[in-house]
Amino acid sequence: MKKTFYHYMMKHRAALFSNEISNLAEAMYDDLSFPKQSEDYDEISSYLELSGMLASMSIFDEAWELYIQDR
């Protein structure tokens, strides 16, 4: 069974050293409206852009690449 992007990102929460990806994971966890069941890049990217959760979408792109490599 494939992990959703949300499920993958939860392993980055509570990192020993905070970084942009761990901060994104925390923000996703705190956002009750985040599309938790999605595996779709466009859906998640659009959601993040509209929510203003990130200062730069390059953080999401980096996290997405890690997600794809881990699948």
Curated annotation (Swiss-Prot):
Signal peptide segment: none
Organism: Bacillus cereus (strain ATCC 10987 / NRS 248)
NCBIfam families associated with the record: PRK13672.1 (NF010193)
Tree of life domain: Bacteria
Matches recorded under InterPro entries: UPF0346, YozE_SAM-like, YozE_SAM-like_sf
Any single Pfam family the record assigns to this protein: YozE_SAM_like
Name of the protein: UPF0346 protein BCE_2336
Family as reported in the entry's similarity comment: Belongs to the UPF0346 family.
